[in-house]
């Protein structure tokens, strides 16, 4: 029987980007994004959610989000910049998560909407219980809030035994909106 590693998936939508006259992949962070990313890095550290591994889109705004968030972690986990994250669908991201070695306790995935939001909803809405909660512990209200807005620099925290399982122990325990 496989050991339960208490794995946690952190889905981090990149911080607010600017819209200069450059290709979409090359868009930098806006001032608000530059300010929000370090706050989110510190929040992860303070919440005890320092990742053991990071998967990050190759888009500049995602790389910049990691660059500004990482110092707040007070750790330097290995990071992989993966071009497959940019433009991916939720199912593509799920496949990338499945490639991560089982020994990784906490995985941080920095990417883009709609895929980040769609993956969070997919995992958080795993089969509902009689109590009206998904197996992930997310209520219909939690899911509705996430559907209505998964803002830039927001993080969904999904905790479970082995990434990604069809049923989760709990989720959206750390739904964190971007820094004010």
Locate each region found by the language model:
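Active-site-proximal alpha-helix that buttresses catalytic centers in soluble enzyme cores
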Residues: 2-84, 88, 92-95, 116, ...
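A glycine-rich beta-strand to alpha-helix segment
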Residues: 104-124
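A polyampholytic, Gly/Pro-enriched intrinsically disordered region
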Residues: 98-109, 166-175
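Domain-level recognition of soluble alpha/beta enzyme cores
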Residues: 124-170, 176-179
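Residue-level preference for the first positions of well-ordered beta-strands
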Residues: 9, 106-108, 155
């Amino acid at each position: 029987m496989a050991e339960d590693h208490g794995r946690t998936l952190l889905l981090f939508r990149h911080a607010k980007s600017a819209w200069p006259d450059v290709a979409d992949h090359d868009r930098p962070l806006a001032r608000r994004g530059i300010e929000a990313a370090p706050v989110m890095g510190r929040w992860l550290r303070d919440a005890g959610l320092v990742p053991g591994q990071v998967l990050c889109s190759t888009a500049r705004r995602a790389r910049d989000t990691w660059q500004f968030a990482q110092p707040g972690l007070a750790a330097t986990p290995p990071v992989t910049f993966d071009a497959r994250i940019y433009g991916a669908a939720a199912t593509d991201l799920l496949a990338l998560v499945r490639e991560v070695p089982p020994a990784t306790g906490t995985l941080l995935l920095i990417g883009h909407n709609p895929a980040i939001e769609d993956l969070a909803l997919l995992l958080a809405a795993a089969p509902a219980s009689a109590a009206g909660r998904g197996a992930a512990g997310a209520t219909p209200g939690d899911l509705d809030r996430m559907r209505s807005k998964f803002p830039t620099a927001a993080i969904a925290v999904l905790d479970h035994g082995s990434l990604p399982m069809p049923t989760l122990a709990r989720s959206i325990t750390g739904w964190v909106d971007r820094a004010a």
